[in-house]
Amino acid sequence: MSTKIVETITLECETGNYHSFCPISCVSWLYQKIEDSFFLVVGTKTCGYFLQNALGVMIFAEPRYAMAELEEGDISAHLNDYEELKTLCIRIRKDRDPSVIIWIGTCTTEIIKMDLEGMAPKLEYEIGVPILVARANGLDYAFTQGEDTVLAVMAHRCPDQEFPIGESKETKKKLFPFPLLKENNLVEYANHPPLVIFGSLPSNLVSQLDTELRRQFIKVSGWLPAQRYADLPSLGDGVYVCGVNPFLSRTATTLIRRKKCELIVAPFPIGPDGTRAWIERICPVFGIEAQSLEEIEERIWESLKDYLDLVRGKSVFFMGDNLIEISIARFLIRCGMIVYEIGIPYLDKRYQAAELALLKKTCIRMCMPIPRIVEKPDNSNQIRRMRELKPDLAITGMAHANPLGARGIGTKWSVEFTFAQIHGFANARDVLELVTRPLRRNENLDNLDRTTLVRKNNK
C-alpha cells in the first residue's frame, strides 16, 4: 500500500508493527526537565529492570521516578489497586514533596485493563497533589511517543489564556505600578499574539532557541513542558503553538482541538537548514520579516566543512526507531549524503507536512534521489534491501546493530540521536559527530590492513 504525499514522495506501509525502543524511557529525560515532578511507572519487574539498566541510574541515587511493581495479586484482582497506589503516592508526597505525580501506564496495565484514569482524580483530591495519567505502553506507541502522551495529558492542565491579546502589558502595569528592574535590559519585542513552543529540550537548548527568536523580535510566552509544573504556559484561543520535535503529533492535536490554539506547521529545528526554516515559518505568522538567517546558516555550514568532506557521497539507511528519522535524513542529504531508505515507526503526514516539503526541496537542491519512506517497516525486508544496496551506514535500533556490523555495515544506534543535543544552529556539529564516528572507525580499520597482522605460520 502506498500513498502519494507530494510529487515523487511516496509512503509505504509494510507490516503495521512497531520495532522500537520502549516508550516508558521518556521518563529518563522528562523527570530531569520537569524539576518538581515525580514519575511513577506502573508495570512489572521487566519495566523496572529496563528503567534501571537502560537508563543507567541506580535506585540508590533516588531519582525522581519509581516503579509501582504489579504482583500476582494485582493481576488476579485480589488486591485493591486504589489502596496500593494511594499508599505509594502518600509515601512519595512525604519523602519527595513533588508538585505533580505522573503515572506512566505500561503494557501490563493495558492488558489487565487497570483504570488509572478513573482512580487518579479521586486520589489527587485525597492527597492534595495533582496526578496525571499517561499511557506509554509499547503495544500502542513507539519509542519517543511516550513523551507525546505525557505532554498531551499535561496540555489539558495548562491554564486558560488570562488576558485578551494586547492587554497583557497594561494589566501588568496595574499589577506592578513600580518600575521593574529586570525589564530595563530586555529587548523591545514586536507586538504579536502569544507563542508557546512545545517539546522537551534541555535548558541550554531552550535558551538557544529563545535567543534565535528574540533576534527576530519574537517573544516566547512559554514552553510545554515548563521546568516547574506551576509555570505551565497559558493556552487558549489566539495563542500560537509550534513544535520542536517530529513525534509530538498527539500533543499538537490536543492543543488544536481541546485548547483551541493555532498550530504553526513548520520544519523542525534540526540542523542549520531546519533551524532556519523553522524560524522563517514562524516570523511571517506575526508579520515579521526574518533577518540575517542566511548569513548565520552559511557561517554554520562553513564551520562544518571538515565533517562535510568526510560524509559527502556516503550512503545511509534508516531502519526506524525514534520518529525523528525524516529530519535527520533531510539534514544528512543537505550534507551531501545519499539516503536510500527512511524507515519510521509512525508518520503523521499533516504534522510533518512542512518537513516532508523541505525534504523534497533539499533533494532537488542537492540533485539527490528522494529516499523511499517506509512506515512500520518489516525488518526482514529491510535486511534484504540492505544486502542489495550495501549502505556505508545504518542508523538502527540496538537489536540490529551488532548483526549488521558483523556483515560489514557501519552502524549507529538511533537512540543516541534522541538523547544527544541536536536542535538549533549550534548543535549541527554534534549530529555529524554521531554520524561520522562509525565511518571514521571503519576507515581506520581499513587503513590498518588487518590481514597482514595475522601470522600464517604461528608455532
From Swiss-Prot:
GO BP term, pick one: photosynthesis, dark reaction
EC numbers: 1.3.7.7
Enzymatic reactions: chlorophyllide a + oxidized 2[4Fe-4S]-[ferredoxin] + 2 ADP + 2 phosphate = protochlorophyllide a + reduced 2[4Fe-4S]-[ferredoxin] + 2 ATP + 2 H2O
GO cellular component: chloroplast
Keyword Iron-sulfur: yes
HAMAP family the record matches: ChlN_BchN
Gene (name only): chlN
Cofactor binding: number and manner: Binds 1 [4Fe-4S] cluster per heterodimer. The cluster is bound at the heterodimer interface by residues from both subunits.
The protein's enzyme class: oxidoreductase
Location of the protein in the cell: Plastid, Chloroplast
Alphabetized Pfam families for the sequence: Oxidored_nitro
Species assigned in the record: Pinus contorta (Shore pine)
Lineage: Eukaryota, Viridiplantae, Streptophyta, Embryophyta, Tracheophyta
Domain of life (superkingdom): Eukaryota
SUPFAM superfamilies: Helical backbone' metal receptor
Pathway(s) where this gene product acts: Porphyrin-containing compound metabolism; chlorophyll biosynthesis (light-independent)
Ligand binding ([4Fe-4S] cluster): C22, C47, C107
The entry's keywords: 4Fe-4S, ATP-binding, Chlorophyll biosynthesis, Chloroplast, Iron, Iron-sulfur, Metal-binding, Nucleotide-binding, Oxidoreductase, Photosynthesis, Plastid
Name this polypeptide is given: Light-independent protochlorophyllide reductase subunit N
Cofactor: [4Fe-4S] cluster
Subunit structure: Protochlorophyllide reductase is composed of three subunits; ChlL, ChlN and ChlB. Forms a heterotetramer of two ChlB and two ChlN subunits.
